[in-house]
């Protein structure tokens, strides 16, 4: 159970929650990318996807640059990672049932330590193709919609119409699954859900003084995307992933100094246990702290309402305080 929970938490740290707060990737402590093979292999795969269900390339796509095709594939894979579309055994029923939240909420594996994703909390968003999908009840992304992120990304990279982009996005995911880069799961409603095998998400520690360009910044909206050394060149000068932004991504260096990066890399992390968290104290010490807080005339070292906020944890009704 501990191993399952650790693997799930790691997937959240480098996936769905990678941009929330001071995460390891956001602070430049680690580089994360999806290992999908050589750039030439991905480019060939993308070019085959342009042929749809037939051999060869559809008319009008012969002149698409390799850099655009590579950005198309790489952007798709990294978006899946950041959306939390990383496979885990706890998400199997969730995927088969079209992303219904009950499998990661009140029907989750509580006994194994699976965390809850109630309404209001962002949930893993796997791309889904085929069949109908009620987006009011599912966090999954309907790839076939011309308004989906995947269709929009395809339109930006290949400069095609939204409807055509949605079809190409579906074909690309299918080709990636055929190549073993993605997994494909049939759903109860007849759709197909695509996911990243956890083993393809690679995490690499970054040194404090590396001079590599490991940050992608949009030249228009200034959106920042941490990048790994293995993939930053594949997205340099690619379209901005923000749906409504016309800008391009530019590779640059991360800030030279980071408080959180230095803290995470430190060997001696100290935990501060505040006295007002009295469940951590012995009975005698707890009584002394509580009495010192409540007495009308306090000594200089007594905790007071300005520094001790969790008063209910000390068994004190704050309404009784003057």
Regions found by a protein language model. Name each.
Residues 299-318:
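Conserved two-lobed SF2 helicase motor
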């Amino acid at each position: 159970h501990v191993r399952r929970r650790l693997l799930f938490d790691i997937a959240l740290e480098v996936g769905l929650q990678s941009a929330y707060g001071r995460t390891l990737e956001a602070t430049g402590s680690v580089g994360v990318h999806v290992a999908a093979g050589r750039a030439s292999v991905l480019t060939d795969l993308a070019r085959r996807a342009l042929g749809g269900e037939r051999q060869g390339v559809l008319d009008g796509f012969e002149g698409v640059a390799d850099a655009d095709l590579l950005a198309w594939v790489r952007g798709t894979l990294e978006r899946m990672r950041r959306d939390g579309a990383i496979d885990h055994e706890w998400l199997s029923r969730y995927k088969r049932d079209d992303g219904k939240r009950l499998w990661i909420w009140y029907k989750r594996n509580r006994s194994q330590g699976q965390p809850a994703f109630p309404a209001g909390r962002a949930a893993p968003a796997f791309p889904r193709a085929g069949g109908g999908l009620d987006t009011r009840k599912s966090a999954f992304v309907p790839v076939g919609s011309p308004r989906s992120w995947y269709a929009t990304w395809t339109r930006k990279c290949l400069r095609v119409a939204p409807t055509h982009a949605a079809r190409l996005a579906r074909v690309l995911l299918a080709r990636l699954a055929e190549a073993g880069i993605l997994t494909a799961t049939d759903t109860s409603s007849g759709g197909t859900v695509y996911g990243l095998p956890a083993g393809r998400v690679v995490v690499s520690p970054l040194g404090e003084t590396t001079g590599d360009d490991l940050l992608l910044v949009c030249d228009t909206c200034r959106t920042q995307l941490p990048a790994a050394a293995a993939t930053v060149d594949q997205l340099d000068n690619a379209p901005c992933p923000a749906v409504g932004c016309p800008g391009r991504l530019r590779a640059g260096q991360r800030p030279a100094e980071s408080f959180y990066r230095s803290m995470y890399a430190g060997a001696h992390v100290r935990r501060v246990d505040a006295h007002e968290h009295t469940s951590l104290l012995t009975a005698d010490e707890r009584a002394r702290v509580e009495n010192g807080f409540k007495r009308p005339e306090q000594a200089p070292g007594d905790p007071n309402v300005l520094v001790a906020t969790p008063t209910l944890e000390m068994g004190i009704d704050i309404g009784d305080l003057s």
